[in-house]
Amino acid sequence: MDKKTSRLRRALRARKKIQELGVNRLVVHRTPRHIYAQVISPEAQVLAAASTVEKTVKELLKSTGNVDAAKAVGKIVAERAIEKGVAIVAFDRSGFKYHGRVAALADAAREAGLKF
């Protein structure tokens, strides 16, 4: 089993558990160059989103593929979710290790007011 398949299996296992809870989830996806975050309802509707691809976010950053960029995205997605009335979410790391950029995004979202 290769690295990508292992990650996807971990992601499916976690998503199944989150689905049983029936709560909104904060989904994170990372690539070497960018990081993306979405708050998704149990009915699969995107309630809030932010990424380093957005022009407004990109202007704030020196580089889009580092921990500082992840912190900025975490803060912005949390602010947008709270504006929509979402304060409690489940964290879906999409099978990525809770380390580095993924952990930085989660910490920034918590500091901005999301609870998980």
From Swiss-Prot:
Q: Which InterPro entries match?
A: Ribosomal_uL18_bac-type (IPR004389), Ribosomal_uL18_bac/euk (IPR005484)
- Matches recorded under SUPFAM superfamilies: Translational machinery components
- One Gene Ontology term, aspect cellular component: cytosolic large ribosomal subunit
Q: Does the keyword Ribosomal protein apply?
A: yes
Q: A Gene Ontology MF term for this entry?
A: structural constituent of ribosome
For this chain's UniProt record, which GO biological process terms are given? translation
What keywords would UniProt list here?
Answer: Ribonucleoprotein, Ribosomal protein, RNA-binding, rRNA-binding
Is the Membrane keyword given for this protein? no
Q: What does this protein do?
A: This is one of the proteins that bind and probably mediate the attachment of the 5S RNA into the large ribosomal subunit, where it forms part of the central protuberance.
Quaternary arrangement and interactors, per the entry?
Part of the 50S ribosomal subunit; part of the 5S rRNA/L5/L18/L25 subcomplex. Contacts the 5S and 23S rRNAs.
Q: Which family does it belong to?
A: Belongs to the universal ribosomal protein uL18 family.
State the name under which the record lists this protein: Large ribosomal subunit protein uL18
Specify the taxonomic lineage: Bacteria, Pseudomonadati, Pseudomonadota, Gammaproteobacteria, Alteromonadales
